[in-house]
Curated annotation (Swiss-Prot):
Organism: Aquifex aeolicus (strain VF5)
A Pfam family of this chain: adh_short_C2
Name of the top EC class for this enzyme: oxidoreductase
Catalytic activity: a 2,3-saturated acyl-[ACP] + NAD(+) = a (2E)-enoyl-[ACP] + NADH + H(+)
GO molecular function list: enoyl-[acyl-carrier-protein] reductase (NADH) activity; identical protein binding
Family label: Belongs to the short-chain dehydrogenases/reductases (SDR) family. FabI subfamily.
Residues involved in NAD(+) binding: 13, 19-20, 64-65, 92, 163, 192-196
Protein's UniProt name: Enoyl-[acyl-carrier-protein] reductase [NADH] FabI
EC assignment: 1.3.1.9
Length: 270
């Protein structure tokens, strides 16, 4: 029996088969979870429905998290189709592309508001609205963060601030929902080759750097993140809440360099 057998999981943020949310859905499906999906805009509907079909699901609903009405409709949709919910996967983050140019000092007021609303407040809004569906089910919520919440990653800009706020939100929500028997955690994933990631200036250099420096010397995959999400949302992690779990092959533990001797050889030769 799979680790999530009999669990009902809502997956937000699936954009394509390279997205982290897709990797999570893939791992959840393998472990026996039933899946429902959201899409943010009409142009994404067909793609998300095709992805859902691949996992044997026809539960797909529009949810623009900047609209309270959409979030209420999401709850109604899940009530009508499932009646209850065990897991929420919050894989939602956005800032206008111009906010990734220049430095954080160039952040616009509107860009800041949008980034915080969609990337952070949406977690609060979804949790509050869907909590009644998780009553008595020892529910689990997982969201996605990144190392840019802790340290400066050039050009990540306002999204780094948003991710820092997201991690704090996880801790506060963990306290709030514990009395209902539910848990929430964040996964701080290393750089993954998603389409969204390539909107960040110099992302390919960031990938090269983190791969060279992390102790394993290899990149992170969506499967790595997906399998971690399975654990965090399973009963095996029943005593874990309010955590930020790094899934980055150990990159966050390093100082300036990792695999120093190999890097010296690359730079200076044998």
């Amino acid at each position: 029996m799979g680790l999530l057998e009999g669990k009902r999981a809502l997956i937000t943020g699936v954009a394509n088969e390279r997205s982290i949310a897709y990797g999570i859905a893939k791992s959840f499906h393998r472990e026996g979870a039933q899946l429902a999906f959201t899409y943010a805009t009409p142009k994404l509907e067909k793609r998300v429905r095709e992805i859902a079909k691949g996992f044997g699901s026809d539960l797909v609903v529009k949810c623009d998290v900047s609209l309270d009405e959409d979030i209420k409709n999401l709850k109604k949709f899940l009530e009508e189709n499932w009646g209850s919910l065990d897991i929420i996967v919050h894989s939602i983050a956005y800032a206008p592309k111009e906010e990734f140019k220049g430095g954080v000092i160039d952040t616009s007021r509107e860009g800041f508001k949008i980034a915080m609303d969609i990337s952070v407040y949406s977690l609060i809004a979804l949790t509050r609205e869907l909590l009644p569906l998780m009553e008595g089910r020892n529910g689990a919520i997982v969201t996605l963060s990144y190392y840019g919440a802790e340290k400066v990653v050039p050009h990540y800009n306002v999204m780094g601030i948003a991710k820092a706020a997201l991690e704090s939100t996880v801790r506060y929500l963990a306290y709030d929902i514990a009395k209902h028997g539910h848990r929430i955690n964040a996964i701080s994933a290393g750089p993954v080759k998603t389409l969204a990631a390539y909107s960040i200036t110099g992302f390919h250099l960031l990938m090269e750097h983190t791969t060279k420096v992390n102790p394993f010397g290899k990149p992170i995959t969506i499967e790595d993140v997906g399998d971690t999400a399975v654990f965090l949302c399973s009963d095996w992690a029943r005593a874990i809440t309010g955590e930020v779990v790094h899934v980055d092959n150990g990159y966050h533990i390093m100082g300036v360099f990792g695999r120093e001797e190999e890097i010296k050889k690359e730079v200076y030769g044998d």
